[in-house]
Amino acid sequence: MLSEMKNYKKLSLSDVRLVASGKEDGCEKQLLVFQTPFGYRRMAELFLPEGAGPFSVILYVHWYEPESRDSNRSQFVNEAVEMAKNGAICLTVETLWSDPDFFVKRTQADDMRNSMEEVVNLRRFMDFLLDQPNADPKRFAYVGHDFGGMYGVLAGSIDRRPTHYVIMAATPRFPDWYLYLPKLEGEPRENFIQEMSAIDPIAHVENLSPAPLLFQFGDNDPHAPKERAEIFFGAAKEPKEMKLYKAGHGLSEESTLARKEWLKNKLHNIA
């Protein structure tokens, strides 16, 4: 599986179709459809700054919370607009977990294959972002919440193009969540844990170095409790920061403000 993630089919222009475009809120927006190598499509929205650049780039990958209205690529739209207005090319993307029923439809037999496909799709989104005119490859941030953060770590350990990371309310091991449903016991459970250990974020987060990392966690998060957060953070190499907020799994407005400020400071040229 790791070889499939490494030797992926790179994105070509023919894989992307423009659905709609317009200018508002001080930036240009483009709604796009991406054809994947796996026979299905993914939506994304591109936010382009005004001016000549060069521009930093940010890939935003949302969380999974089926009871929340922003458990999809809409989660980071407002943030992407703000960052684009201040000089960053931003892309918000559809994922496997954009489907509210994704978790109950899958089984552990699907998780490794789904993970491989998700990493390939993320790498192809990176291809697209860095192919934008005036994109600065030396200022490329990956921002991921929940599964978005976990798969970002895995993708980034293979694809070293992102130069900065914000990892939000992520857990260090996929079985922490993928064993919620369906229930596994005994040898099948242990076999699954062993299988997924090859791609667990905690096994790969050190490979993001020397990219600066910002970890954001809530102090009342049942899915990424403080103990797991500290283990995950401890496995990462410097430079790194971890912030704990008075929040649950969805984090807080305070964390949003801190994240935007961190990105602006790290990527430079964003006022």
Protein language model features and the residues they cover:
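Short beta-strand element of the alpha/beta-hydrolase
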Residues: A44, P54-E65
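Cap/lid segment of the alpha/beta-hydrolase catalytic domain
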Residues: Y64-V120, W177-Y180
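C-terminal catalytic histidine-bearing segment of alpha/beta-hydrolase fold enzymes
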Residues: G234-A271
